[in-house]
Regions:
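Extreme N-terminal tail/first-helix region
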Residues: 1-28
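Short, contiguous alpha-helical
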Residues: 9-10, 46-92, 119, 130-171
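Short coil/turn segments at secondary-structure junctions
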Residues: 10-18, 95-105, 145
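Hydrophobic packing residues in well-ordered alpha-helices of helical domains and bundles
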Residues: 19, 23-26, 56, 104-111, ...
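Acidic/histidine-rich alpha-helical segments that form the ligand environment
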Residues: 25-30, 36, 94-131
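A glycine-rich, hydrophobic loop/mini-helix early in the fold
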Residues: 28-31, 35, 39-50
Length: 171
């Protein structure tokens, strides 16, 4: 019995530290983008380093679209009991918006507002709230995800794009 209790305590601690790490990454991303872009003008932020590469503006517009699409999925997991959610492609979603035409700072401002709201909602969740789940359809049949797995997905995705943003603005 003591081994099982120790394992449960260890799992809860690991779960809590993963949640803290995800919340830190999610809350820091907009600030990191602002620091990376500090002192650059719109022309620099809209410049593509080469024909097939995204500009800084396109990267942030993509992150904003992902945050909106995936953030809505998280909101549904929190507010509904195990919903079935049809997968929405952020790349398809962005084509329905004017995000790619907006100036960089407006896109970053809107992304930052969305992110602040998501982080606020996530911080209010009890530990068990992070395990709320949904079944996703549309790309793979019946794939399940949790609030934590989706929040982690967003954070990991953004880390890769922050590296891309740094490379883009160095070239």
């Amino acid at each position: 019995m003591k081994k099982r209790e120790a394992k449960r305590a260890s799992d809860a601690h690991a779960h809590a530290s993963e949640i803290r790490a995800v919340l830190t990454l999610l809350s820091e991303t907009p600030k990191t983008i602002a620091r990376i872009a500090q002192g650059l003008d719109e022309q620099q932020l809209h410049r593509q380093p080469d024909v097939d590469a995204w500009s800084a503006q396109e990267i942030v517009a993509h992150l904003r679209a992902c945050a909106e699409v995936w953030g809505r999925s998280i909101d549904r997991m929190v507010t509904e009991d195990h919903p079935t959610i049809r997968y929405v492609s952020p790349r398809g979603w962005i084509r329905k918006t004017d995000y790619l035409q907006q100036d960089f700072r407006e896109t970053l401002r809107k992304f930052s507002e969305q992110r602040a709201g998501l982080v606020t909602r996530l911080r209010k969740l009890p530990a068990r709230g992070w395990t709320r789940s949904a079944t996703f359809t549309g790309t793979t049949s019946g794939r399940d995800g949790t609030v934590l797995s989706y929040a982690n997905r967003i954070a990991e995705h953004e880390v890769r794009h922050l590296d891309q943003l740094r490379r883009t603005l160095k070239s």
